[in-house]
Design a protein with these regions (language model features):
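Short hydrophobic alpha-helical runs that function as membrane-insertion/retention elements
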Residues: 49-52, 107-109
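Internal gly/pro-rich beta-alpha loop/helix module
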Residues: 60-166
């Protein structure tokens, strides 16, 4: 109930709310439970999930990874994917396979962008104050996202969701 309350309160007068997941999608408070995982948050809030999958150095294995997420818990709420660190050509081929095999949407991709790398450490990203040229990096990433991610499709997915009530 606390989660639903906080989302309802903070989403008031907003068109779209984005809930960012933590760690692995099914990783919860313990090693063998989904309690407090991003999966559980999606269930409690009845939110559709767009999984961001690293495709670095892979092709068909990306499909196996996605299939694993979809079948691990059949009620996963996963409605689509965005592939990260992938070439446009490979994305085009994999997107067709993702949509035909799994019936979920491939919303786009981000290519490898070495000039825009955001460092991380054990428990997450470094703080904004620690990132050199952050504003410029974000502008470059935003411009790329506008080119290679179906932002209208993501908005359409968001519009299909019933508002969370408390």
């Amino acid at each position: 109930n606390t989660l639903r309350y906080l989302l309802t309160k903070n989403a008031a007068d907003r068109d779209v709310s984005i809930i960012e997941g933590v760690m692995g999608y099914y990783d919860g408070m313990g090693l063998t439970t989904t309690h407090a995982s991003s999966y559980e948050v999606s269930k409690v809030t009845d939110s559709p999930v767009v999984l961001v999958v690293s495709a670095k150095g892979a092709s068909l294995s990306v499909l196996a990874t996605i299939q694993g997420f979809l079948t691990f818990c059949p009620d996963s709420n996963i409605r689509g994917v965005i592939l990260n660190q992938i070439s446009p050509m490979t994305y085009t081929a994999l997107a067709k396979e993702i949509e035909s095999r799994f019936g979920i949407c491939a919303y786009g991709y981000l290519p490898k962008m070495t000039d825009c790398t955001l460092e991380s450490r054990h428990l997450g990203l470094v703080t904004a104050a620690e990132v050199e040229n952050l504003r410029e990096k974000l502008q470059v990433m935003a411009a790329q996202a506008e080119k290679s991610i179906d932002l209208n499709g993501l908005l359409k997915l968001a519009e299909s969701v019933n508002p969370v009530s408390y």
